[in-house]
């Protein structure tokens, strides 16, 4: 659950949403109100936080908090 909390922290900070709004199945655009620039900045923040690189083609597939967690777990 610690990974979820770390991802949630980044999402809350980047998208300026309440922690209560962020669930594993929350969609960045539809549920959390992100636009395309927000998503790019979110991916960059995740890369920095977890010291990983998310290729553009794979970043496009990350639409939910759970998608981000799965990607990070498999790096």
Curated annotation (Swiss-Prot):
GO terms for cellular component: cytosol; membrane. The modification O-(pantetheine 4'-phosphoryl)serine is found at residue 36. Residues 1-75 form the Carrier domain. The keyword Lipid metabolism applies. Coiled coil: none annotated. 4'-phosphopantetheine is transferred from CoA to a specific serine of apo-ACP by AcpS. This modification is essential for activity because fatty acids are bound in thioester linkage to the sulfhydryl of the prosthetic group. Carrier of the growing fatty acid chain in fatty acid biosynthesis. This is Acyl carrier protein.
């Amino acid at each position: 659950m610690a990974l979820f909390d770390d991802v949630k922290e980044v999402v809350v900070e980047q998208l300026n949403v309440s922690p209560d709004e962020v669930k594993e199945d929350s969609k960045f655009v539809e549920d959390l109100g992100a636009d395309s620039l927000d998503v790019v900045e979110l991916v960059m923040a995740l890369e920095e936080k977890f010291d990983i690189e998310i290729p553009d083609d794979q970043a496009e597939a990350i639409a939910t908090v759970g998608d981000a967690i799965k990607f990070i777990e498999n790096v």
